[in-house]
Amino acid sequence: MASNMNKKNDDLLIIKKLYIKDISFENLLSSKKISSNSEPAVDINVKLSSVNIENNDHELILYIKAETRVEKQIMFIIELQYAGIFELKISDEKKNREFVVEGAKILFPYVRTIITNITKDGGFNPLIIQPLDFNKIYSN
């Protein structure tokens, strides 16, 4: 039964490699006490890009930048580019949207885990990014 549930993705792409392409974490309040009782504000920007590497192999990159502030002080900034190499089993150009959206859904749990762990290891409450609508992100 599980193989039938995954049939749509199996027809579309094969995961060949997943990796961190670039990462940066700036801990701007590590040695300072946060004196505010205010809830931190988090701004998250997300971008997707894909490039054909060769033949049917494509690299998909999920870019996430998160900036967290308390009042006017920046607590931390994290920038992550997480990528995957996928073999596309389709060649129809209108399927590009489906590839990018499905590929981003594969990459996202890894991105969320990395960001959660880095912010926790940076001395802050873990930043847990809520599920994203990759169809909407692709459209923008």
Which residues fall in each region the model found?
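N-terminal intrinsically disordered, cationic/polar leader segments
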Residues: M1-N140
